[in-house]
UniProtKB/Swiss-Prot annotation:
Its main location: cytoplasm. Pathway: Amino-acid biosynthesis; L-arginine biosynthesis; L-arginine from L-ornithine and carbamoyl phosphate: step 1/3. This is Ornithine carbamoyltransferase. Transmembrane segments: none annotated. It catalyses: carbamoyl phosphate + L-ornithine = L-citrulline + phosphate + H(+). GO terms for cellular component: cytoplasm. It comes from Methanococcus aeolicus (strain ATCC BAA-1280 / DSM 17508 / OCM 812 / Nankai-3). Pfam families: OTCace (PF00185), OTCace_N (PF02729). Its EC number is 2.1.3.3. It is found in: Cytoplasm. Reversibly catalyzes the transfer of the carbamoyl group from carbamoyl phosphate (CP) to the N(epsilon) atom of ornithine (ORN) to produce L-citrulline. L-ornithine binds at residues 156, 221, 225-226. SUPFAM superfamilies: Aspartate/ornithine carbamoyltransferase (SSF53671).
Length: 304
């Protein structure tokens, strides 16, 4: 059982994961799901929240974590992913990997024989979205029927958000400049889920106000990630400011709307200090919930 994207999860699966996460949040060291298990944590790019939350999750679940930074090992450098996957499968019980290319994760699942969890790739960020859904549920007491508004680059986080929100029956609005839309495959999958369930909707627009109007949740991410070297920075700084979450944009949303950002944030760019530090911001709850959601993911993986 692997978790590379959310596409193979049904609503009941996510509901179970969120319920388990709520339990783990109330009972920090309650279960030894990973007793006598070793988890390899592989990082091809810098990480704060992902690394710390997974490390703590493994240890609080009774397991042992082994962190492998690619700059210090042969992983993704001098050794093929195929060989790395086969060798690690002899040593560890789970592979958690934060990678630059999603294909690396697919190779781990193809050539290894232990569960693989996507801690972030260029295509998807499923664990972040499970933490996001947990945060929304905590603050709104439901998911189905909410208007979820995303602003900015249609990146890996956006891809996973539209999938997760579609599964949970939410109305998804994505405001992004032309040419920066989310991955078409994920948009199609989200629409198929919506059609099948007969609940929710998805709208991709370049109009931030349409996106923000009467929204229950406003969400943004960095306009340019640390690993994205293909974007024209000057162009980004020119065309993205209308998608900044600021007090004016927030005024179009519902009065009790919450504001989210997966962090790290470039304050003054995709979001202002006033908003991220304001009463409607839940970014630190969101960050904390990475720990609890990821514990629930381990439980889900080993219950299959």
């Amino acid at each position: 059982m692997h978790l590379l994207t959310l596409e193979n999860l049904e609503r009941k699966d996510i509901e179970n994961i969120l319920n388990d996460a709520i339990y783990f949040k109330k009972n920090r060291k309650s279960e030894n799901i990973l007793k006598e298990k070793t988890v390899a944590l592989i990082f091809e790019s810098p990480s704060t929240r992902t690394r710390i939350s997974f490390d703590i999750a493994v240890n609080e679940l009774g397991g042992h974590s082994l962190t492998l930074n690619t700059g210090e090992t042969h992983v993704s450098k001098k050794e093929s992913t195929k060989d790395t996957a086969k060798v690690l499968s002899r040593f560890v019980d789970v592979i958690v990997a934060r990678v630059k290319e999603h294909s690396t994760l697919e190779d781990f699942t193809k050539y290894g024989n232990v569960p693989v969890i996507n801690a972030l790739s260029d295509l998807s960020h499923p664990c972040q979205i499970l933490a996001d859904l947990l945060t929304i549920k905590e603050h709104k007491n439901k998911l189905s029927g909410l208007k979820f508004a995303y602003f900015g680059d249609g990146n890996n986080v956006c891809n996973s958000l539209i999938l997760g929100c579609a599964i949970m029956g939410m109305d998804i609005f994505v405001a992004t400049p032309e040419g920066y839309e989310p991955n078409e495959k994920f948009v199609k999958m989200a629409q198929q889920i919506i059609d099948k369930q007969g609940e929710g909707s998805i709208t991709i627009t370049d109009d931030a106000i349409i996106c923000a109007k009467d929204a229950d949740v406003l969400y943004t991410d960095v306009w340019v990630s640390m690993s994205d070297k293909n974007k024209n920075i000057d162009e980004v700084l020119k065309i993205f400011p209308p998608y900044q979450i600021n007090e004016k944009l927030l005024s179009y949303a519902k009065k009790d709307a919450i504001v989210m950002h997966c962090l790290p944030a470039n304050r003054g760019m995709e979001i202002t200090d006033e908003v991220i530090d304001g009463e409607q911001s839940v970014v630190y709850d969101e960050a904390e919930n990475r720990l609890h959601a990821q514990k629930a993911v381990f439980k889900y993986i080993f219950s299959k």
